[in-house]
């Protein structure tokens, strides 16, 4: 998730290189490019321009915020109107919705790693079911299993005794799924790992490794809605030592809120060490 946070998008390019650079990096952006952030139009414009220029180097996955109803509620429509005026803002907003309907719901990396925005829901669908979907895909035509790809969440590993599929607080159509569902889904589809996004966790490090190392949560927007969370990026590389092996390296994007607080604490500690700490008067 980027959620209109331009600084985090530019930080990714600074740290890993641009898609057209000599290092040959391919980027997968896992949905929720817009809503809530301060630079939604800039982020969307950059991503779409890169996709047009380098279609094999930039992949855009549809998230639950690539949706008209969500955009009308959580800020993208307002951003279009306030930045572009009513006439051009409305036109840009409508064109963006048409683009979203053509975005894929997932991508497959090296035939072993599935990247999707939300989750697997009941996990009874297959990769072939995904391949058979025709675009454009309107929300009104979405079956529950499709809807859950953008909306469902995993059950935390610490919640012992929970197996299978359960109702989600997100809504009637949405499910939560336990580790056994992930395990069976991966086995049925020949997968080693599912990478998903969708959830920001307050004060988190930006990623979670779950469900017996078969599920990875990645959330890239730092300090999302003031949560003080780190962001994270997953770097996938072929192993030079082992054939058909992919290394997954996780890079944390440090929360600026945390960094400032830690700097303040270090500064105060240094003052105390030098005898320059704040003194209080006792009465």
Where are these predicted regions, by residue range?
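Feature recognizes metal-dependent phosphohydrolase scaffolds
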Residues: 2-283
